[in-house]
C-alpha cells in the first residue's frame, strides 16, 4: 500500500509546485496567459524530459560551407599593405594570377577606406594597424561556443547600461524588450503604444518610425543593424548613422570581414556605444537557422539528401536575417521578449517603410518563423543552446 501512495504523493507534490509557479507568473505578469506560464514552467527545469535531436541534422547544420572563403578573405586583407605600390607588389609576387576574390578584396579595401589608400600619414597608419588588429581578434573568436548565450549580458547589456548612466551594473536582465521587425504586416496593426511600453525597444536596420508611430511606436533603445548599413553610413561625414538619435547605442553584426574597417573608422566619432556581436554568437545563430531551414526543407520537399537543400538555398551565401539575430539577442538579455513585425502576407509589402516586395533568397524566413514559434511555445526544442540557459517568456504578435 505504501508503494502505491508514493507515486500519488509525488504527483500531487509536482502539481502543487507547478500551480505555485503558474500563480507566481500570473502575479508578476500584467498580461497573463496560460500558454506563457506553461512555457516558463518548462524553462524553469521542472519539466525535465530531454528533446532528442537528429544527430545527422545537427552535424550538417554545424558545417559552414563559406568557412574556406572566409579564412582566405581574412588572410588576404591581413596581408594587404595600405599603399597601392605595396599592394601591387604583393599580388605581382604571386605565382598565379589574382583570383576574382583577391581582386574583389582589393576593390573593397579601396572603396571602404575613409583615407586615400596611398596616404602615408601617421593617422592613416594608426587606423590601418588598429583595423588589422581588430580583424584578427574578431576572426579568432569565430567558433562554436554555446555558453556565449550566458555572456550576452556582460558583452552587450552592461556597456549600454554604463552609457545610460546606470550606477549599479548587474547581471540582471531587462524586464521587458520589444523587437520590432520591418514586415509590411505592421501596416495593418496599431501596436505603437504597446511597443513603447516596453523597457527596451530594439529596431532593425535603421527602419523609419516617422509617420508610422501608431503602428511601430517611436521609442528606440537599441539600434540593431548589419554591417552593410554602417558601410553605407560610412560615406557620410563623421559616419553619421543615427536616425533614432546620437545617444542610441548600435549593435551590429559583421557581414563581411572588410566591414571591420568601417567599424574601426566610425567608432571614434560615435557618442553612443558601437558594439559588434561576438563571432561566437554569430556562429550559434547560423547553426540554429540552418538547422531549422534544413529540417523544414526535408519535411516539405521530401528531399533525399542535404545536397538538394544547398542547391535551393544559395549554398555558402545562406545566412540568418538581422531580425533573427536581434530576437536571439533579446532572448539573451531580457526577462520577457515581445516580437512585432515578423511575418508576411501576399497583400503587404516586404518592408513597411520601403517599396521592396521580394525577399532575399539567402535568408529562409519561413524557417526563422518556426524558430520564433518554438521560442514562444516549445523552447526546449531549439538546438545548440546550453542546457543551463534559461529562455525567457516570448510572445509573437501577428
Curated annotation (Swiss-Prot):
- On the Lumenal side, which residues? 28-398
Subcellular locations according to the entry: Golgi apparatus membrane
Q: Show which residues sit on the Cytoplasmic side of the membrane.
A: 1-6
| Classification via Gene3D superfamilies | Glycosyl transferase family 29
Keywords assigned:
Glycoprotein, Glycosyltransferase, Golgi apparatus, Membrane, Signal-anchor, Transferase, Transmembrane, Transmembrane helix
Share what the entry says about its subunit structure, partners included: Interacts with GALT31A.
Protein name, UniProt field: Beta-1,6-galactosyltransferase GALT29A
Which species is this UniProt entry from? Arabidopsis thaliana
Q: What is the lineage of its organism?
A: Eukaryota, Viridiplantae, Streptophyta, Embryophyta, Tracheophyta
* Gene coding for it: GALT29A
Amino acid at each position: 500500500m505504501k508503494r502505491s501512495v508514493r507515486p500519488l504523493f509525488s504527483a500531487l507534490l509536482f502539481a502543487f509546485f507547478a500551480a505555485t509557479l503558474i500563480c507566481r507568473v500570473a502575479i508578476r505578469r500584467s498580461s497573463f496567459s496560460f500558454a506563457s506560464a506553461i512555457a516558463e514552467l518548462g524553462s524553469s527545469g521542472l519539466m525535465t524530459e530531454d528533446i532528442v535531436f537528429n544527430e545527422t541534422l545537427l552535424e550538417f547544420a554545424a558545417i559552414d560551407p563559406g568557412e574556406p572563403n572566409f579564412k582566405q578573405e581574412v588572410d588576404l586583407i591581413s596581408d594587404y599593405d595600405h599603399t597601392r605600390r605595396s599592394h601591387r607588389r604583393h599580388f605581382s609576387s604571386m605565382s598565379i594570377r589574382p583570383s576574382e576574390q583577391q581582386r574583389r578584396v582589393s576593390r573593397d579595401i579601396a572603396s571602404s577606406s575613409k583615407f586615400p589608400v596611398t596616404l602615408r600619414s601617421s593617422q592613416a597608419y594608426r587606423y590601418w594597424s588598429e583595423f588589422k588588429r581588430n580583424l584578427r581578434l574578431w576572426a579568432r573568436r569565430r567558433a562554436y561556443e554555446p555558453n556565449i548565450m550566458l555572456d550576452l549580458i556582460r558583452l552587450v547589456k552592461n556597456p549600454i547600461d554604463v552609457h545610460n548612466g546606470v550606477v549599479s551594473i548587474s547581471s540582471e536582465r531587462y524586464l521587458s524588450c520589444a523587437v520590432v521587425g520591418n514586415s509590411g504586416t505592421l501596416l495593418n496593426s496599431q501596436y505603437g503604444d504597446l511597443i513603447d511600453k516596453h523597457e527596451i525597444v530594439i529596431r532593425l536596420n535603421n527602419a523609419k518610425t516617422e509617420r508610422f508611430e501608431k503602428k511601430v511606436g517611436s521609442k528606440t533603445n537599441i539600434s540593431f543593424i548589419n554591417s552593410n548599413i554602417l558601410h553605407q553610413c560610412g560615406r557620410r561625414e563623421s559616419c553619421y548613422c543615427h536616425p533614432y538619435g546620437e545617444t542610441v547605442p548600435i549593435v551590429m553584426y559583421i557581414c563581411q570581414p572588410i566591414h571591420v574597417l568601417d567599424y574601426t573608422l566610425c567608432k571614434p566619432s560615435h557618442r553612443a556605444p558601437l558594439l559588434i556581436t561576438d563571432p561566437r554568437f554569430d556562429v550559434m545563430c547560423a547553426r540554429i537557422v540552418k538547422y531549422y531551414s534544413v529540417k523544414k526543407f526535408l519535411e516539405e520537399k521530401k528531399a533525399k539528401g542535404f545536397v538538394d537543400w544547398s542547391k535551393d538555398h544559395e549554398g555558402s551565401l545562406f545566412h540568418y536575417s538581422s531580425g533573427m539575430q536581434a530576437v536571439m539577442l533579446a532572448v539573451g538579455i531580457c526577462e520577457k521578449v515581445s516580437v512585432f513585425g515578423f511575418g508576411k502576407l501576399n497583400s503587404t509589402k516586404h518592408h513597411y517603410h520601403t517599396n521592396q516586395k521580394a525577399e532575399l533568397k539567402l535568408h529562409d524566413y519561413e524557417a526563422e518563423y518556426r524558430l520564433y514559434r518554438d521560442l514562444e511555445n516549445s523552447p526546449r526544442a531549439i538546438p545548440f543552446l546550453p542546457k543551463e540557459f534559461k529562455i525567457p517568456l516570448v510572445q509573437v504578435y501577428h
